[in-house]
Amino acid sequence: MGDWSALGKLLDKVQAYSTAGGKVWLSVLFIFRILLLGTAVESAWGDEQSAFRCNTQQPGCENVCYDKSFPISHVRFWVLQIIFVSVPTLLYLAHVFYVMRKEEKLNKKEEELKVAQTDGVNVEMHLKQIEIKKFKYGIEEHGKVKMRGGLLRTYIISILFKSIFEVAFLLIQWYIYGFSLSAVYTCKRDPCPHQVDCFLSRPTEKTIFIIFMLVVSLVSLALNIIELFYVFFKGVKDRVKGKSDPYHATSGALSPTKDCGSQKYAYFNGCSSPTAPLSPMSPPGYKPVTGDRNNSSCRNYNKQASEQNWANYSAEQNRMGQAGSTISNSHAQPFDFPDDNQNSKKLAAGHELQPLAIVDQRPSSRASSRASSRPRPDDLEI
């Protein structure tokens, strides 16, 4: 019974990483196969060969007739059936242990990267790659292993092989001695001198156990088929809902996450300005490029705009005929747009911004005085 307990401990670990159908299958395997085989069935077949009698005194005739009637004992046959049926499940358990080992290595590497991140090293991409590997292996946040990818394929293959082994052993059992036992077996083999009759001990009790084990095998086969369809339709459902691959990887690397909340600067006509992220309805050719506001082309653009504003202001005052000297475009001082760092440095140093001089303090020439005193057609008469 020590071998049975070791097998039971291994299969008990499989139950933690199986579906509902897999857990029911394991319960059937434990209760109706291993437990029953280790208690009632083994005791019923305990006197199988010793109680097999033939109506002859020829030495060796009973052994030869028993070997012909039962090439393999029912108990040993069912033990082989349980072992073969359990092997695919144990292989799936080995895959689970492999995934758990990978999880330990990834967690250790993730801790090392986080320690390096605290020292100022940029390891964000490596951490994302570790998350993708965990997702590929089916590792959840709290160490739980979920069936997906290679683990799911291994589970499906194990179900297929379990079903194949169940069908194969049922056919072998039917071919060797059927599903019932008779009380009398006729034998004619050397060294028997003639055809002899051999008698089996407790044939009815053994037939009941054979039928019971047959029903258990059919139930296990039905559970495997139901579980196979369940896993298949669940996988299709997850793909329809788009839950199969939440991470998007391109050429082995993560695609960068788009930050829509941060404000960026984009170049318009060679100058940068704060702008919001592009909307989905932007035309294909509209591609603002993020850049720095301290570009020399931008400063020239701002200077030209300032000079044009002063020229427009002077022309407007000349047109309205307002008193006072006009402001010439050549004497206008353009606004300067220093960057934020320069402003902060100046303010920190205690310097204040000087206001722009918008009135020309030079005396007007005689030509300009005579020109300004001449009446114009658009002047108002008082």
From Swiss-Prot:
Sequence segments annotated as region (Interaction with NOV): 244-382
Function: Gap junction protein that acts as a regulator of bladder capacity. A gap junction consists of a cluster of closely packed pairs of transmembrane channels, the connexons, through which materials of low MW diffuse from one cell to a neighboring cell. May play a critical role in the physiology of hearing by participating in the recycling of potassium to the cochlear endolymph. Negative regulator of bladder functional capacity: acts by enhancing intercellular electrical and chemical transmission, thus sensitizing bladder muscles to cholinergic neural stimuli and causing them to contract.
Domain of life, per lineage: Eukaryota
Record InterPro entries: Alpha_helix_dom_sf (IPR035091), Connexin (IPR000500), Connexin43 (IPR002261), Connexin43_C (IPR013124), Connexin_C (IPR034634), Connexin_CCC (IPR019570), Connexin_CS (IPR017990), Connexin_N (IPR013092)
Keyword Membrane: yes
Entry coiled-coil feature ranges: none
Cross-link (Glycyl lysine isopeptide (Lys-Gly) (interchain with G-Cter in SUMO)), chain numbering: 144, 237
UniProt KW Ion transport keyword: no
Gene giving rise to this polypeptide: GJA1
Modified residues (Phosphoserine): 5, 255, 262, 306, 314, 325, 328, 330, 344, 365, 368-369, 373
Compartment(s) of residence: Cell membrane; Cell junction, Gap junction; Endoplasmic reticulum
Chief localization: membrane
Protein name: Gap junction alpha-1 protein
Stretches for region Interaction with UBQLN4: 264-382
Disulphide connectivity of cysteines: 54-192, 187-198
Side of membrane Cytoplasmic, spans: 2-23, 98-155, 229-382
Residue stretches spanning the membrane: 24-44, 77-97, 156-176, 208-228
Entry comment on modification after translation: Phosphorylation at Ser-325, Ser-328 and Ser-330 by CK1 modulates gap junction assembly. Phosphorylated at Ser-368 by PRKCG; phosphorylation induces disassembly of gap junction plaques and inhibition of gap junction activity. Phosphorylation at Ser-368 by PRKCD triggers its internalization into small vesicles leading to proteasome-mediated degradation. Sumoylated with SUMO1, SUMO2 and SUMO3, which may regulate the level of functional Cx43 gap junctions at the plasma membrane. May be desumoylated by SENP1 or SENP2.
S-nitrosocysteine modifications at: 271
A GO molecular-function annotation: gap junction channel activity
Skewed-composition ranges (Low complexity): 362-374
Ranges annotated as biased composition (Polar residues): 317-332
Protein family per UniProt: Belongs to the connexin family. Alpha-type (group II) subfamily.
UniProt GO cellular component terms: apical plasma membrane; connexin complex; endoplasmic reticulum; intercalated disc; plasma membrane
Topology within the bilayer: Multi-pass membrane protein
